[in-house]
Amino acid sequence: MHHRMNEMNLSPVGMEQLTSSSVSNALPVSGSHLGLAASPTHSAIPAPGLPVAIPNLGPSLSSLPSALSLMLPMGIGDRGVMCGLPERNYTLPPPPYPHLESSYFRTILPGILSYLADRPPPQYIHPNSINVDGNTALSITNNPSALDPYQSNGNVGLEPGIVSIDSRSVNTHGAQSLHPSDGHEVALDTAITMENVSRVTSPISTDGMAEELTMDGVAGEHSQIPNGSRSHEPLSVDSVSNNLAADAVGHGGVIPMHGNGLELPVVMETDHIASRVNGMSDSALSDSIHTVAMSTNSVSVALSTSHNLASLESVSLHEVGLSLEPVAVSSITQEVAMGTGHVDVSSDSLSFVSPSLQMEDSNSNKENMATLFTIWCTLCDRAYPSDCPEHGPVTFVPDTPIESRARLSLPKQLVLRQSIVGAEVGVWTGETIPVRTCFGPLIGQQSHSMEVAEWTDKAVNHIWKIYHNGVLEFCIITTDENECNWMMFVRKARNREEQNLVAYPHDGKIFFCTSQDIPPENELLFYYSRDYAQQIGVPEHPDVHLCNCGKECNSYTEFKAHLTSHIHNHLPTQGHSGSHGPSHSKERKWKCSMCPQAFISPSKLHVHFMGHMGMKPHKCDFCSKAFSDPSNLRTHLKIHTGQKNYRCTLCDKSFTQKAHLESHMVIHTGEKNLKCDYCDKLFMRRQDLKQHVLIHTQERQIKCPKCDKLFLRTNHLKKHLNSHEGKRDYVCEKCTKAYLTKYHLTRHLKTCKGPTSSSSAPEEEEEDDSEEEDLADSVGTEDCRINSAVYSADESLSAHK
């Protein structure tokens, strides 16, 4: 009941008569009964049934239990009280009122109410005056009505042009309470004046904004608002020479300040004010104007918000003159104390510190305070922007450093030291590591980016390419110690003597395996396995810079220059290198010192030297195949693009290379013009000749377990074993002939015309030279040129013929 009555919006100034039959003959009473200042007497309470108006309680009584609930019957609050506002008119219930017979209600309470009736009503500013959706719950009219004259202990006139707002100028709504229970807000009974404070015009939209003016500790003399200043003017704060009423000290009150034609000088925090442009009305703002300290000659106002400061220009927030003028933003000085929450505003400087009580509800303000005050002195119980001036600096104890994942994952048998290959950190052995000891897998960041995959510097060892079926799948990047393990610190060997680890891929991962016993106090140095080196297009051995002549080169550039010197040593004399030199005569005068081959130009010889050294820098992007000659790469790319520019004039078959066309034309002529250099045997196809030459140049080391026949390659042995078992899995669908290999079946299909086919020779097949080597059958097998039957030995073929 008490709470409901305290929340009522009571009538404006002007004490109306109470209605009670039990006190109809009582004598007039006044505030002098209570020892208060004299006030006009009032008539006796009239007959029941008339309206009753209850005046507003002053701020000095806001903390006391409401006396109104004592004078009305129980339950009257539920039905209402007759007030001056139309929307709150109610009628008292019929008499009698037995509890009004006491002397308290006859004399004392009417005196209190009559005293309060003489005073101007308190003015309030409440943060809830504007709803979240931006609609004003309370508004100020364009022409607020004048206040009744009120003077206490002399008249103190305010300067012209200053207008205060009372409750009569407020169009209140029934749902809005003007009696909050918040004790931190103080009533303003007179106008507020400030001096030497610039005005601000803020671009912050008032849509969804609630402003709150909070006064703590108002002290001073009473002030009067002249009648001449009661016309509608913007509320200005220009001077603090006129002091506020002392009756408002330590009490709370709220003034609704919403509507058109209202101006306020404000001081804005630089870190928490953002420019608001049109179209932001849907967002909820909560900008509060806090007065954190008020004394006799100083008042401070701060606008705190969670937005950043932007350039402020004069803008109109409403159609009818609501605007804010520019303001100078003050800075924090060292004299400000956070604990007290006091602020001084003077003509020279303005200092602002928000009290901690107001900072608790704003995360952005908390962050701002953390940056403004870095040191908290526990002896002074306050914060300082630097060291305490009295007790000096504090002692900081840092955290224990946390090592990275790469360093923490290092095995106990290994240690990290400076590398001998020039790197900052390398991995060294603390004890003997036996041969065939594996480490891994290598852990790093996986990347599928083509930019990383096509890293041009293949010498760096922090990019590891992973292939699947000859196609680049992803890369492992070992640059971040927190994302990798200790294997990122293992460095690459510079030559064969330094290498003691072999890096190889397995199941999409990289492992290191020792190639020898590694004694203590030795650094682990790796190089790639032979197969992996071929995949990534690097030399098969780390001593790639060691020339065949015995020259050691520290870099590839030096090694390339050294190879050029070998080429110049084979150049012809000046008399033979004129305009009609080898480029025109096509004479192969540039011979390789490592093999019998000769070339028509030094550039061709240079490329040939790179092949001897295992250097294939030109790599295919489609199948990861590498070439030492860029022209070979261009020719190889035609296989992927399907470009065939060389066409046979007899059968309209097309080829990607001219050499393939020439080899194909032999099928139509039947000529065998390819002769072996070691014997007089002739061949129609170049691939057959190359396969034959291997018999003379390479030693067969792979032996058949059934017939002791030797082979050059394992796949040749597998094909040979099928002949022992009688397996001919590749059958022609036209003539039902079977073959040991798919290669021979493919050759047969090119000439097969059915069961009565009797083509003389198989047709040429277009294949890359290196691929044809893999498809070719073992050297010991021969096929019949008459019916394409395959035989494992020359003797069997002769018997067949």
From Swiss-Prot:
Zinc finger spans (C2H2-type) are 545-566, 618-640, 646-668, 674-696, 702-724, 730-752
Q: Name one GO cellular component term.
A: nucleus
| E.C. number(s) listed in UniProt | 2.1.1.-
User: Could you tell me where the Acidic residues compositional bias lies?
Assistant: 762-776
Tell me where in this chain the SET domain is found: 412-529
- InterPro entries listed in its UniProt record: PRDM4, PRDM4_PR/SET, PRDM4_Znf, SET_dom, SET_dom_sf, Zinc_finger, Znf_C2H2_sf, Znf_C2H2_type
Q: Specify where it is mainly localized.
A: nucleus
GO BP annotations of the record are: methylation; positive regulation of transcription by RNA polymerase II; regulation of gene expression; transcription by RNA polymerase II
Q: Which SMART domains match?
A: ZnF_C2H2
Q: Where in the cell is it found?
A: Nucleus
Q: Which PROSITE patterns match?
A: SET, ZINC_FINGER_C2H2_1, ZINC_FINGER_C2H2_2
Q: In which tissues is it expressed?
A: Expressed in many tissues. Highly expressed in ovary, testis, pancreas, brain, heart and prostate.
Please provide the record's keywords in A-Z order. Answer: DNA-binding, Metal-binding, Methyltransferase, Nucleus, Repeat, S-adenosyl-L-methionine, Transcription, Transcription regulation, Transferase, Zinc, Zinc-finger
Ranges for the region named Disordered are 751-782
GO MF assignments: DNA-binding transcription activator activity, RNA polymerase II-specific; DNA-binding transcription factor activity, RNA polymerase II-specific; histone methyltransferase binding; methyltransferase activity; RNA polymerase II cis-regulatory region sequence-specific DNA binding; sequence-specific double-stranded DNA binding; zinc ion binding
The cross-references to PANTHER family, in alphabetical order and at most eight, read: PR DOMAIN ZINC FINGER PROTEIN, PR DOMAIN ZINC FINGER PROTEIN 4
Its function, per the record, reads: May function as a transcription factor involved in cell differentiation.
| Entry's family note | Belongs to the class V-like SAM-binding methyltransferase superfamily.
Protein name per Swiss-Prot or TrEMBL = PR domain zinc finger protein 4
This protein's species is Homo sapiens
